[in-house]
Amino acid sequence: MKDLLNFLKAQHKTEEFDAIKIGLASPDMIRSWSFGEVKKPETINYRTFKPERDGLFCARIFGPVKDYECLCGKYKRLKHRGVICEKCGVEVTQTKVRRDRMGHIELASPVAHIWFLKSLPSRIGLLMDMPLRDIERVLYFEMYVVTEPGMTDLERGQMLTEEEYLDRLEEWGDEFTAKMGAEAIKDLLASMDLPAEAEQMREELDTTNSETKRKKLTKRLKLVEAFVASGNKPEWMILTVLPVLPPDLRPLVPLDGGRFATSDLNDLYRRVINRNNRLKRLLELAAPDIIVRNEKRMLQESVDALLDNGRRGRAITGSNKRPLKSLADMIKGKQGRFRQNLLGKRVDYSGRSVITVGPYLRLHQCGLPKKMALELFKPFIYSKLETRGLATTIKAAKKMVEREEAVVWDILDEVIREHPVLLNRAPTLHRLGIQAFEPVLIEGKAIQLHPLVCAAYNADFDGDQMAVHVPLTLEAQLEARTLMMSTNNILSPASGDPIIVPSQDVVLGLYYMTREKINAKGEGMYLTGPAEAEKAYRTKTAELHARVKVRITETIKHENGKLTTETKMIDTTVGRAMLWQIVPKGLPYSLVNQKLGKKQISNLLNEAYRKLGLKDTVIFADQIMYTGFAYAALSGVSVGIDDMVVPAAKYTEIAEAEEEVREIQEQFQSGLVTAGERYNKVIDIWASTNDRVAKAMMENLSSEQVINRQGEQEKQESFNSIYMMADSGARGSAAQIRQLAGMRGLMARPDGSIIETPITANFKEGLNVLQYFISTHGARKGLADTALKTANSGYLTRRLVDVAQDVVVTEHDCGTLEGVVMTPHIEGGDVKVALTELALGRVVSEDILKPGTDEVLIPRNTLLDEKWCKVINDNSVDQIKVRSVVTCDSDFGCCAQCYGRDLARGHLVNQGEAVGVIAAQSIGEPGTQLTMRTFHIGGAASTAAAENSIQAKNNGSVKLHNAKFVTNKDGKLVITSRASELTIIDEFGRTKEKHKLPYGSMLSKADGDAVAAGETVANWEAHTMPIITEVAGRVQFVDMIDGVTVSRQTDDLTGLSSSEVTEAAARPAAGKDMRPAIKLVDANGKDVLIPGTDMPAQYFLPGKAIVNLDDGAEVNVGDTLARIPQKSGGNKDITGGLPRVADLFEARKPKEPAILAEHSGTVSFGKETKGKRRLIITRDSGDTYEEMIPKHRQLNVFEGERIERGDVIADGPESPHDILRLRGIHAVTTYIANEVQEVYRLQGVKINDKHIETIVRQMLRKCTITFAGDSEFLPGETVEYSQVKIANRKLVEEGKEPARFERELLGITKASLATESFISAASFQETTRVLTEAAVSGKRDDLRGLKENVIVGRLIPAGTGFAYHQDRQAKRAQEQQGPSAEQATDNLAALLNAGFSSDDE
């Protein structure tokens, strides 16, 4: 009985575990794993193919080669199980033990483990505080190291050369010991007293002041403490016993012809064993030192190669000149264990085939070829045949299926009914790349796919292939049906818009059906309803496009779900009335009573989903598709060459343009314009010509003259096939039609610059050779780009998934009061994104009040749905504070309230939803649509004039934000602050426009003034920065000496003089320390004070400033004292597209970032150095902060000006790290979200902000401790934010002082590698480094994220696995109290019963 129980236990040895710990293995531990020592390098006998004894494949050590049979054949069969044969020493058991029994090699001399030696930073080096060079010299027998100084004046760890060693030996004899090789290092490591070292370093940390020293000490202290805490011993980094991998994991297979295919590891092990045995023999023979040393060095090198080939020196190569694959290579990289076998496995019950269209399928169906279905569902068919008694055994059933008897097909039908299958199309860029369908059996060999899901799969039918997978268990079928069925995935998880949207033919059909035609047959009929309209159409009494009056009954769905009907006569067309028949009840007729393009149809489906729910929408979508196909066929729309009408105006336009170009060419030759101007002007001419031709062509195509019923001429939209395709959004665009019938226009070179000779021909006329050649030039680059883009985009997605994989919704509400403030997205005069669009699906974090009152409109913690958004719009609320993932307070993952609505489902997100992965997929999936290029600002773009005024685009009133200003003598306001903004607000208080106001702008309107559209509100000089006086008085020059600090020029024409301040570097010696300034004095020559301060009004002038005033001139408030010319922006390349998104998420610092003020205070300038300026900020408390700024940077601040922390001192692209440090988390979140959205918006891709916020949350995972308090942390160390939060909570509860910290922003790659989980980090990148670090510090992985759980083969803690994990946690908490006695007895009884009732062997 006991044996039976033990046997059963041995069969199911998957103990449940909750964490994985990694550490260093001690020699005893390695011996305890081992089943015997491998003594010989032999593998198998080449004649008998039996493993050699004591060799690498030895059956005595590793187990039998055949199941339950010893090597010599004395014991066979199950009955001898567990017997050890006395002849060959092999245990009789299953052969699969050869997969997990390890051996070992006793090394004749210790060997350093290369990972801890060479993986930077070297752990051995750091621990012993010795340079890596020195350690290597000792290990490879070049120098001696003192291990025991004894009574001599040597020091422990001192390096000695051969000569020095011999000298010392003569001097002191055996007073001291010095050794070389790994033994020496081992002795040094073993003799270290780690706790004492740690103590000493802590004391040193408190006393030392040097920053570099502190950094070094902190690093070393952390390592030492990790060793102490984990129970690892430092000497274990030196190997004395080498474990041997089980033989079935490094197989050796005989090929025919007497050759063998073998794993590289066998070669590497053979080398080690050979050298080890030779070393043993040499030691026994007491060979000369030099020979032994050489052998030991070779042993070290061969062990290095086995563990990590190529890490040190040249890689050992096999017979084919390729480096051998070592143990480290087995686990790292795309082909390594992690990514090849653990994160992505191939599965059975799957098939793949080409896809074709299934236009007659329902949305939840797919067509599956019978042949394929038969193969996939074989086991189900066998079992059915058996239970029905149609086949006696499985073998018989197999025969029946192979013969394909008639009954088999009937059973296949039954088996398949309501058994969903999964269809997947590679690349699976987001979760809609795998969906479930019910299979319908079809003839042929191609899978049929429903046209409406093509958008989600990004599939077309030009030879795409798809894979089919069969969910086997009931749970899997249930999940496939409830969660993955195509009918349950109508909305896109990225934006919440419908993704089941008709395209191409369907759109064209519906568009054709809903167009109107003047004077069509049957115009003016009165019809009793859609049915009669259809009858009229079918009997040919009325055309599809005829304008008629029809009696329509609308059903209105009310808030409470009640339905009421309303009937009225509506002016419409026959086609629209017929379409109304398929529209579900509850939608208004106005949605159909228009010409339906792609946008309108999408809107129609969206409305249906929001108002009527899932089921009606799905049925409706199918009906739309069938109708669309039917009428596209009836329309007879086709592409004919005569449909491309070339406008007559084209030739005259081109002739005019050529004339203009000729003129500019002449001007250039006579030197009136520069080469650059000529190029830009030529390009502008051709671009505008192209536009004019295109406009003429579109006007020509889009309308035609017809005679209406009154016999008059009337214009109507044309029924030109090509125009209809483009107008409906089915295929093609205005830009493409322009190339067909207008002119092709300007072409780009591969570097993005524009070729100045345009292609004047179009495709209808045909291109000549030159034109064809020009057009291939840029087009080829496009193709190359696309190939690169795909790889880049895939890599971005991989990094995003990796950083965000463990963000799961873990609780309903974290209880935080924090949130982010949402305002509409306004650029210049346009509202780009409305507030309601941004806030939809978010949870309000504080009560929204009715503007101007204290009445609560929306209470906090309300989920904003479409209904509430209407309330926000109607009350013209301008900003809302909503909860955000970034500010969520959950320790792990985030909470449902902070995330808000699940976009793909339309309600509050469920607990267990893997929102991190969804966010990563939503950002990564459109990556292939983004451009790869860096835009060169060339051609038309660079000539745009710099802005110098603000014109209102809407009526409303002016509002100024954080603006300081003075009023000048004309009564105009002059701005004297930096970061001012001007907004224009409509009568409801909604922000319509937002503009930046530069320093020195003149406003013609004051705060609160009314403004009309088109009025100029503010203006300023574009290329200079003024210095504005805030007081009136008389000018007095200080330190402004002509020829020393300033140079005066007098204009010959006007006679006016101006002085330009010379830069400090260019002045003669006398003027170096002078500081030119303009002081304002009153009539008696006394200093005028700046209002509100006791500082005299003195304005220091930077270099290059130009002063147009004379000494003693009178000035008024708001006058310009001096002007500083601004360098124009120049042609800076803008990084756009995919690289820009990657830069943002990697949090890369820009080349020349904007310089932001570190503190609030008053600015002054100190002594300058050769290339830098010294900027001093005096804080209100009186202490100063200095910063050196390169001279070539243009500063935005003057001496004596007050600035706030985070203000821009020098312009440039802002660095996200600075934004976080100086303006906080909200600012950096907004910055990254807006910048990323900018790129996607250009491509017309919609992504919800919350996905970007989820990634930003993960980038902010770490923080740096600034003050340790009573915590365990060290100041300056970087710790997981959640760790600090939990630790501080504890400290506060105990009444101790919590640690203080600053949040850090990490790029996504860094953040992925810095996760808590070493398994996840190791499977991402830099596997060796991650594992080395984890092993040394004895890390424990709690398997919190998704990736770790996939790798160890458990259910993931998300989705349906979330409940399972919650359960386990609750159980564990219970178990810590311990089970009761009764429970224990029950458990035992259950075990025994299980043992008896089992029908296992």
Curated annotation (Swiss-Prot):
GO terms for molecular function: DNA binding; DNA-directed RNA polymerase activity; magnesium ion binding; zinc ion binding. Zn(2+) 1 binds at residues 70, 72, 85, 88. The RNAP catalytic core consists of 2 alpha, 1 beta, 1 beta' and 1 omega subunit. When a sigma factor is associated with the core the holoenzyme is formed, which can initiate transcription. It catalyses: RNA(n) + a ribonucleoside 5'-triphosphate = RNA(n+1) + diphosphate. It is an enzyme of class 2 (transferase). HAMAP family: RNApol_bact_RpoC. GO terms for biological process: DNA-templated transcription. The keyword Magnesium applies. This is DNA-directed RNA polymerase subunit beta'. It comes from the Bacteria. Residues 1375-1386 have a biased composition (Polar residues). Its cofactor is Mg(2+); Zn(2+). Keywords: DNA-directed RNA polymerase, Magnesium, Metal-binding, Nucleotidyltransferase, Transcription, Transferase, Zinc. Belongs to the RNA polymerase beta' chain family. Zn(2+) 2 binds at residues 814, 888, 895, 898. It comes from Vibrio cholerae serotype O1 (strain ATCC 39315 / El Tor Inaba N16961). Its EC number is 2.7.7.6. Gene3D superfamilies: 1.10.132.30, 1.10.150.390, 1.10.1790.20, 1.10.40.90, 2.40.40.20, 2.40.50.100, RNA polymerase II, clamp domain (4.10.860.120), RNA polymerase Rpb1, domain 3 (1.10.274.100). Residues 1368-1387 are annotated as: Disordered. DNA-dependent RNA polymerase catalyzes the transcription of DNA into RNA using the four ribonucleoside triphosphates as substrates. Mg(2+) binds at residues 460, 462, 464. GO terms for cellular component: DNA-directed RNA polymerase complex. Binds 1 Mg(2+) ion per subunit. InterPro entries: DNA-dir_RpoC_beta_prime (IPR045867), DNA-dir_RpoC_beta_prime_bact (IPR012754), RNA_pol_asu (IPR000722), RNA_pol_N (IPR006592), RNA_pol_Rpb1_1 (IPR007080), RNA_pol_Rpb1_3 (IPR007066), RNA_pol_Rpb1_3_sf (IPR042102), RNA_pol_Rpb1_4 (IPR007083).
